Amino acid sequence: MGQVLPLVTRQGDRIAIVSGLRTPFARQATAFHGIPAVDLGKMVVGELLARSEIPAEVIEQLVFGQVVQMPEAPNIAREIVLGTGMNVHTDAYSVSRACATSFQAIANVAESLMAGTIRAGIAGGADSSSVLPIGVSKKLARVLVDVNKARTMSQRLKLFSRLRLRDLMPVPPAVAEYSTGLRMGDTAEQMAKTYGITREQQDALAHRSHQRAAQAWSDGKLKEEVMTAFIPPYKQPLAEDNNIRGNSSLADYAKLRPAFDRKHGTVTAANSTPLTDGAAAVILMTESRAKELGLVPLGYLRSYAFTAIDVWQDMLLGPAWSTPLALERAGLTMSDLTLIDMHEAFAAQTLANIQLLGSERFARDVLGRAHATGEVDDSKFNVLGGSIAYGHPFAATGARMITQTLHELRRRGGGFGLVTACAAGGLGAAMVVEAE
């Protein structure tokens, strides 16, 4: 066991997660069609503050993330402060760590709490796959800049004459890695082939995810942590996630064709996360500040770790890399955990990470560790379903997972939970949380 790194303030206070909330998650171009991420962020933070009954002036910092950036609101965090009636002097800044963005936001607020610069803050993220920054071609963009500098009409017309019809076509946001040109699904296909993960195994995990998420909603386990969203023109509120397929069968999954490697692939739309809209946020405080305000925390942040690997091959192994670090810093092992919540970007990615967490060879030859991190106990793993079922608004997923895990830990009488995710760019994140 390596060095334990206690997450406490100089006064010995633990980092308390007082409450958390999210919007329902909606598939692209459905219930939240036309609602930008900044509005989803304002929606969830405003409701979170209202439900907590914490005076807005208590919140000294807001760190928020958005992966699909909108040029008109580049600092989503500050816009949320200004749009929710919070104190205008509240510090606010935005972060981005791809699919681990709200992990980063939570870590940043925790670090401010440990440094003593604040005593309470909000962290979270929002993304919309329905409101996208549609751009222009590089050639058109350059011509437009030059036209703005041109002095005469003839100069402007000459510049425009260089354009062809194809240069005028809109350019949607890139779905591939900038450095490699590989799509996430291409990487998932790599991982399925590298680790011998079959189509049947992927479909079974996806089916499990949907079944458990549907059961969680049916049992009322998510009601406290998901708000009802009222969307213009306010005719039909959205109270639950709309991606969950509770009535599907394994035979339904088998009907879908591969989405990326269409000839030999096993990754389909059904065993991958869909493009999703939504927002999530949590309130963090020092333990003593929570006591002053008479608040009972959901739980505490015990440790966190971020990692990075190469992007050319099997880059979605973030959980296999970051989990041993987070456990080490928490002074725990896999057997100490009550719950494990892993982001399901793709079923293939999830199964590959599970395999490597239990691999002695991976631990020894790749991580340089004496022993495997530990086998993943299925009875502890994604017990309420995962991202394949709920959906994945990139910047919101981490806050969803942490809030969900803490509520479930409390229902089980407390314990430790691991929350972990892969992210674009070969990044990984893991956090250990504790509930009493």
UniProtKB/Swiss-Prot annotation:
Note the Pfam families from the entry: Thiolase_C, Thiolase_N
Name the major location.
cytoplasm
Pathway membership of this protein?
A: Lipid metabolism; fatty acid beta-oxidation
Q: Any idea which UniProt keywords this protein has?
A: Acyltransferase, Cytoplasm, Fatty acid metabolism, Lipid degradation, Lipid metabolism, Transferase
Instruction: State if Transferase is listed as a keyword.
Output: yes
One GO term describing the cellular component: cytosol
Question: Does the keyword GTP-binding belong to this entry?
Answer: no
UniProt-annotated catalytic positions: 99 (acyl-thioester intermediate), 392 (proton acceptor), 422 (proton acceptor)
Q: Subcellular localization, per the record?
A: Cytoplasm
Per the UniProt entry, what are the Gene Ontology biological process annotations, in alphabetical order? Answer: fatty acid beta-oxidation
Identify the InterPro entries for this entry.
Ac-CoA_C-AcTrfase_FadI, Thiolase, Thiolase-like, Thiolase_acyl_enz_int_AS, Thiolase_AS, Thiolase_C, Thiolase_CS, Thiolase_N
Oligomer status and interactors: Heterotetramer of two alpha chains (FadJ) and two beta chains (FadI).
Q: What job does this protein perform?
A: Catalyzes the final step of fatty acid oxidation in which acetyl-CoA is released and the CoA ester of a fatty acid two carbons shorter is formed.
Q: What family is it from?
A: Belongs to the thiolase-like superfamily. Thiolase family.
The protein's matches in NCBIfam families, at most eight in alphabetical order, are given as: AcCoA-C-Actrans, FadI, PRK08963.1
User: What is the protein name for this chain?
Assistant: 3-ketoacyl-CoA thiolase
Q: What gene is behind this protein?
A: fadI
